[in-house]
């Protein structure tokens, strides 16, 4: 479908009177021209990546949630480094071990239920980077300890801290090993292997944990021969530990429309994803689950005629936050806005969605760039960045698209993937749902007839 909007800019005399104003080179050019905006809907399909890198993250995701795309489970694996200058001796008397994790401040999902996490010791050292989301590392059968907390706003403590009731044997081993092991980063890493925090199967939320600058670790408590209480902490954040930190993020779409996406070459067309609240269809971007939207651009500029010059090319799409939809009006009544009771804490709309080139197998290739070589992001507008029911994403692809057409005119559609930036997949659980097909918008300039 094509929609053409034509407007005449103000005459040159008025422009001269307003010469001190900042001009819009697209809609207020010099000299005056006729501006025509042509739009065309684009095919959109949801695809799911087979795997993506989740190693050396800035933020760790933890938990389990069940939403539009099915069950998503995020599990962080990490190693620890010992303190410098700490003295641990075999003749010291063990007291206890505690685990702590700085909360990242964000929770997504149903926060009306208690959440429980379990800490396990790894049997093997985690693999070094790059590590992908489908990787796992064997762990001991019994947890070192567990912790239960309320996930609601204002209820999550800034630091999750709990005693490891099943770690007494480990604590005594650490004292017995002495400073030669406990004070040497490489030896300690080889000794402990690492830890994994796992969400209980009953959990309904995904939370963020902050591993930076000693944000997570275990604290060993003991007292010396004179009865003086002492402690030292083994923490995350050291540069040598970063390559061994990663997340396993697994999405199981069983029972949802997206269960047809069994491999990355599969695609779910927009119209085939119609459901309640989305009568025309939907397409999904969900970084934690690996979901991206494939869009196919025409191999010629919509609205191209002799005498027109393309001034700007954009891709735009409308989204609605999961759970919000509008019911059709009944005769004599107004349409009703409905909020499904899907989640107590709505998933945020990503502040930006990046565009990538792709191929017939839906592989993520180079990022689309502008004239300065910077990645092109679709920016969320007309919506609150913290809580919004809907909004519009807009991406300026002028440089990329015109350059691409000049090199490969007539060679078929240009396919792009829209998704959470690949370097931010481990830091956000943002979920974006298109409720209408995306469109390409071309702003044309043509001379004003005298």
Each PLM stretch: what is its role?
Residues 2-5, 20-450:
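Secreted, disulfide-rich extracellular signaling modules
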Residues 5-13:
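Sec-dependent signal peptide hydrophobic core
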């Amino acid at each position: 479908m094509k929609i053409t909007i034509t407007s005449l800019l103000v005459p040159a005399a008025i422009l001269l009177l307003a010469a001190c104003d900042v001009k819009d080179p697209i809609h207020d050019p010099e000299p005056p021209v006729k501006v025509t905006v042509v739009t065309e809907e684009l095919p959109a399909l949801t695809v799911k990546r087979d795997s993506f890198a989740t190693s050396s993250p800035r933020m760790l995701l933890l938990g389990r949630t069940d939403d539009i795309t099915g069950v998503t489970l995020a599990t962080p694996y990490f190693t620890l480094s010992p303190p410098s200058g700490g003295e641990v001796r075999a003749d010291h008397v063990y007291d206890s071990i505690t685990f702590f994790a700085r909360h990242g401040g964000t929770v997504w999902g149903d926060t009306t239920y208690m959440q429980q996490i379990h800490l396990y010791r790894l049997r093997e050292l985690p693999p070094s980077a790059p590590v992908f989301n489908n990787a796992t590392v064997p762990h001991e059968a019994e947890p070192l300890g567990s912790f239960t907390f309320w996930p609601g706003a204002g209820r999550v403590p800034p630091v999750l801290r709990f005693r490891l009731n099943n770690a007494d044997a480990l604590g005594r081993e650490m004292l017995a090993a002495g400073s030669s092991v406990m004070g040497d980063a490489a030896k300690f890493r080889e000794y402990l292997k690492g830890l994994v925090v796992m969400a209980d199967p009953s959990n309904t939320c995904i939370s963020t944990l902050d591993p930076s600058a000693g944000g997570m670790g275990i604290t060993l408590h003991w007292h010396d021969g004179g009865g003086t209480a002492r402690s030292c902490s083994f923490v995350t954040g050291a540069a040598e530990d970063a390559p061994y930190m990663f997340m396993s993020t697994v999405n199981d779409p069983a029972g949802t429309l997206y269960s047809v996406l069994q491999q990355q070459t599969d695609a779910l067309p927009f119209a085939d994803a119609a459901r309640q609240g989305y009568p025309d269809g939907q397409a999904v971007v969900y970084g934690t689950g690996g979901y991206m939207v494939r869009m196919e651009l025409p191999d010629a500029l919509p609205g191209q005629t002799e005498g027109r010059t393309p001034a700007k090319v954009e891709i735009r799409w409308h989204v609605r936050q999961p759970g919000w939809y509008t019911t059709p009006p009944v005769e004599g009544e107004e349409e009703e806005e409905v909020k499904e009771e899907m989640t107590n804490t709505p998933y945020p709309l990503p502040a930006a969605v990046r565009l990538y080139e792709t191929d017939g197998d839906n592989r993520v290739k180079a990022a689309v760039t502008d004239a300065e070589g910077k990645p092109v992001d679709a920016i969320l507008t007309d919506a609150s960045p913290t809580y919004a029911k809907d909004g519009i994403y807009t991406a300026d692809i002028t440089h990329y698209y015109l350059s691409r057409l000049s090199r490969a005119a007539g060679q078929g559609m240009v396919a792009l993937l829209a998704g959470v930036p690949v370097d931010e997949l481990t830091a956000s659980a943002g979920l974006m749902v298109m409720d209408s097909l995306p469109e390409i918008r071309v702003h044309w300039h043509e001379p004003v007839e005298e």
